[in-house]
């Protein structure tokens, strides 16, 4: 599921990166992979209501709000909530992705940079530590799951990042995302 393009389909765009030398195999060699080009909209997948909307990133990127009954998850990867400022505005309407994440049970969000790193990478489409804490508070998320960490960060760096972030969240539970993590939304 990814943003529609006027020039190439999602499969073609993903195939560009999932191929040698960047990736050991080609997309065409992956079994049972289906690609869906999505426009900003709300649609249903079984019992799930999915809202997709554009979020701030140099390339077209969608954030998602997924609702089943009264449980809601927002998924925002490659997301820079407010270009070039250290803190998020107090007004949600000025903050990318806030409508998707407002009041969610679980916010799954990009956690790429420390504040110092972000200052050197404004406009790259990722968030800083302070922006992430501000955004989580602004939207009132109950739980935050971090992922999309900077690949140059060590485990110790990630531990420090999460310790600082946890002290800034004002009540939202923090979960460090790891492969195959399962989160019970109803808790």
Residue ranges and their predicted role:
Residues 1-87, 97-98, 156-187:
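Binuclear metal-dependent hydrolase catalytic cores
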Residues 82-178:
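Cap/insert and terminal regions of metallo-dependent hydrolase folds
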């Amino acid at each position: 599921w990814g943003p529609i393009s006027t020039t190439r389909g999602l499969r073609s765009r993903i195939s560009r990166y999932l191929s040698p030398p960047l990736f050991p195999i080609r997309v065409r060699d992956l079994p049972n992979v289906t690609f869906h080009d999505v426009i900003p909209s709300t649609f249903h997948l079984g019992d799930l209501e999915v809202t997709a909307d554009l979020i701030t990133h140099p390339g077209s990127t969608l954030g998602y709000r997924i609702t089943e009954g009264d449980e809601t998850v927002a998924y925002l990867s490659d997301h820079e909530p407010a270009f070039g400022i250290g803190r998020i505005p107090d007004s949600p309407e000025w903050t990318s992705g806030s409508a998707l994440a407002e009041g969610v049970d679980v916010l799954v969000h990009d956690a790429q940079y420390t504040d110092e790193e972000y200052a050197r990478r404004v406009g790259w489409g990722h968030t800083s530590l302070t922006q992430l804490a501000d955004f989580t508070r602004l939207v009132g998320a109950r739980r935050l799951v971090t992922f999309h960490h900077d690949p140059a960060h060590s485990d110790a760096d990630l531990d420090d990042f999460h310790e600082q972030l946890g002290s800034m969240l004002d009540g939202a539970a923090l979960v460090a995302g790891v492969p195959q993590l399962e989160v019970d939304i109803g808790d």
